[in-house]
Amino acid sequence: MDTIENNVYEITSCFAIRIVHLYKYLTEVRHEYIMSKQLFRSGTNIGANTFEGKNAQSRADFCNKMIIALKEATESGFWLDLLHKTDYLTEEQYTSLYDDWNKIMGVLTKIVKATKQ
């Protein structure tokens, strides 16, 4: 397996863990339940789909899992922006999460483009 593909599992897993901790913070401390649940769902699904891609039955199946992960990542970016713009995330929290999110978007985009060729 390519180094970039190995790397995507690690970074999406770490991101999912951060999202779980953020969800706990948002619900327990900030008492925000709607947007945080959406982010929880999409943010953890990124890792779930990249993990499923490890056992893909074909190149097309692998590509499909990475496309789904990319769509989930795109949605997660929306929820991060919204939580930040509605003052549920500080600038520091947002910037840190956004940097990780941006890295994931880049890696997944690269994998999808390479796999489609």
Write out the residue ranges for each language-model feature:
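Short, C-terminally biased terminal segments at protein or domain edges
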Residues: 1-48, 52-117
